[in-house]
């Protein structure tokens, strides 16, 4: 979640609900739009693909942030940063800022200053900033604005007299490790220019993937829950296949709202699959093991699945005792191909393939067009 410079200038708070802004919408020229995650994801993928052309070392940190490994002197890297910024703006149409430094923590700070200081023109190389100005910039930044420092941690640091980024950079690393953690000690060292946080080129190599969301309208029937689980199984299959992974264990869960303690229910089930798989049918079948534990009439406000014990597809033994013929059917790739061609929700597993958004999905009545992924939402131009 973020705000544009224009929103900040109007004094709009981060996460401020629309109903508070609506009375002044016309005066301020505001237009309400629903979250368009499909468009965001596609634009993000385009940006990351473009950035990957500039370096063999790319870590996609989040939907709107990436780290790249680069080499060169400050002048060369500033030119590279400007080239990346210009290319993303020209080819994708979104503005980006570039922060360059010898450590990831300092690169984050350089990016922040590039974003907020017009003098940098969107690209800041830490080593090109004079030492006295570096200190002034760090002294003017609260420690809570530092990467990985939470509100709770900030309070503990403040109690020790550490209020700014400069204060933390000057702190004794060993004392920080003993009082807090080795993670924060690494941050101190990174602020001093010692690389401690490596570039993670394959962040998907994790232990688990979770697909879960709260419902706009509670689900109170096993049939409704079956649709939810089928959709999540299909999403999990696509994500696993995209990164060349298979799952050995699937956990499905549901929960009522904590605001309704009278009908509290939190069923869950853990299924160990015979073999690691990314097949959507097998994942859905495992998720459906939750259905006998769903109480008819109870209003469930949230559900999801978690796949764990993830393994690279290439590591599967060719002479396994238990063969898995389902992977050869190619159902997952087929679903993805149809979805790419006709749009998300155009095909699915059983009830998950029902056309049109179910009642429980997030309400997005003011959705902007998904120009890059839906043919039927492209603008039409008529020539007279």
Descriptions of predicted regions:
Residues 138, 145, 153-299, 382-383:
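DNA-contacting surface of Y-family translesion DNA polymerases
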Residues 266, 273-384:
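Acidic, metal-coordinating catalytic segment for phosphate/diphosphate chemistry
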């Amino acid at each position: 979640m973020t705000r544009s410079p224009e929103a900040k200038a109007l004094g709009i708070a981060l996460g401020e609900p629309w109903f508070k802004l609506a009375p002044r919408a016309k005066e301020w020229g505001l237009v309400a739009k629903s979250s368009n995650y499909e468009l965001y994801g596609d634009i993000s993928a385009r940006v990351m693909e473009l950035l990957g052309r500039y370096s063999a070392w790319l870590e996609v940190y989040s939907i709107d942030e990436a780290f790249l490994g680069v080499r060169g002197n400050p002048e060369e890297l500033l030119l590279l940063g400007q080239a990346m910024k210009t290319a993303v703006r020209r080819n994708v149409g979104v503005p980006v800022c570039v922060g360059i430094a010898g450590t990831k923590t300092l690169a984050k700070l350089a990016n922040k200053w590039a974003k907020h200081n017009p003098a940098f023109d969107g690209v800041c190389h830490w080593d090109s900033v004079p030492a006295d100005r570096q200190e002034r910039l760090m002294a003017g930044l609260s420690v809570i604005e530092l990467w990985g420092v939470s509100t709770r941690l900030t309070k503990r640091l403040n109690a020790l007299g550490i209020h700014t980024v400069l204060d933390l950079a000057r702190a004794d690393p060993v004392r920080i490790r003993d009082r807090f953690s080795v993670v924060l000690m690494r941050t101190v060292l990174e602020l001093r220019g010692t690389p401690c946080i490596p570039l993670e080129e394959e962040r998907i190599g994790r232990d688990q993937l979770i697909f879960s969301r709260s419902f706009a309208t509670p689900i109170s029937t096993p049939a409704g829950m079956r649709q939810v689980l089928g959709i999540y199984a299909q999403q999990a299959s696509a994500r696993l296949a995209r990164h060349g992974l298979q799952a050995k264990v699937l956990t499905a869960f549901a929960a009522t709202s904590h605001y309704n303690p009278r009908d509290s229910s939190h069923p869950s089930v853990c299924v160990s699959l015979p073999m690691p798989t990314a097949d959507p049918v097998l994942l859905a079948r495992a998720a459906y093991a939750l259905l006998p534990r769903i109480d008819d009439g109870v209003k469930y406000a949230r559900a999801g699945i978690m796949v764990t014990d993830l393994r690279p597809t290439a590591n599967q033994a060719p002479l396994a005792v238990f063969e898995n013929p389902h992977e050869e059917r190619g159902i997952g790739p087929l679903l993805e191909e149809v979805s790419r061609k006709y749009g998300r929700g155009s095909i699915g597993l059983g009830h998950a393939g029902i056309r049109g958004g179910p009642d429980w999905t997030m309400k997005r009545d003011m959705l902007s067009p998904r120009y890059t992924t839906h043919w039927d939402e492209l603008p039409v131009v008529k020539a007279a």
